[in-house]
Amino acid sequence: MVDAFCATWKLTDSQNFDEYMKALGVGFATRQVGNVTKPTVIISQEGGKVVIRTQCTFKNTEISFQLGEEFEETSIDDRNCKSVIRLDGDKLIHVQKWDGKETNCVREIKDGKMVVTLTFGDVVAVRCYEKA
């Protein structure tokens, strides 16, 4: 089912992302850049692992992982996290844990678009991507 996510995706819409970044403790200057940047996300499968590359003018990141296995990740805003990504039905669920905190990123395909729902506490942001 990961195959449905394997593509190059371009951000087309973002809702409540500034509030989400603020809740995470992201500084003002970084939030300003984050709010105007339109990242490209490339999801692929390479040798039994899933690879998610995020490219933008601010910073490029890459994570490579096995579904369901914990791995260490440095987030785009420089948090050192223990992460697990698993497939739950047609959703790719990414859980990041750091300093006793936890955030969830749920990716799903709806009408040919990738909808990403980011949750930290009671703050929810939604970002929509279309195939590039």
From Swiss-Prot:
Entry comment describing in which tissues the protein is expressed: Expressed in brain and other neural tissues.
Binding site for a fatty acid: 127-129
PROSITE patterns in the record: FABP
One GO term (biological process): startle response
Residues of the signal peptide: none
InterPro entries assigned: Calycin, Fatty_acid-bd, ILBP, Lipocln_cytosolic_FA-bd_dom
One GO CC term, this protein: cytosol
Sequence positions bearing N-acetylvaline: 2
Gene3D superfamilies hit by this protein: 2.40.128.20
Note on domains (UniProt): Forms a beta-barrel structure that accommodates hydrophobic ligands in its interior.
Function (record text): B-FABP could be involved in the transport of a so far unknown hydrophobic ligand with potential morphogenic activity during CNS development. It is required for the establishment of the radial glial fiber system in developing brain, a system that is necessary for the migration of immature neurons to establish cortical layers.
Name the UniProt record assigns to this protein: Fatty acid-binding protein, brain
Recorded name of the encoding gene: Fabp7
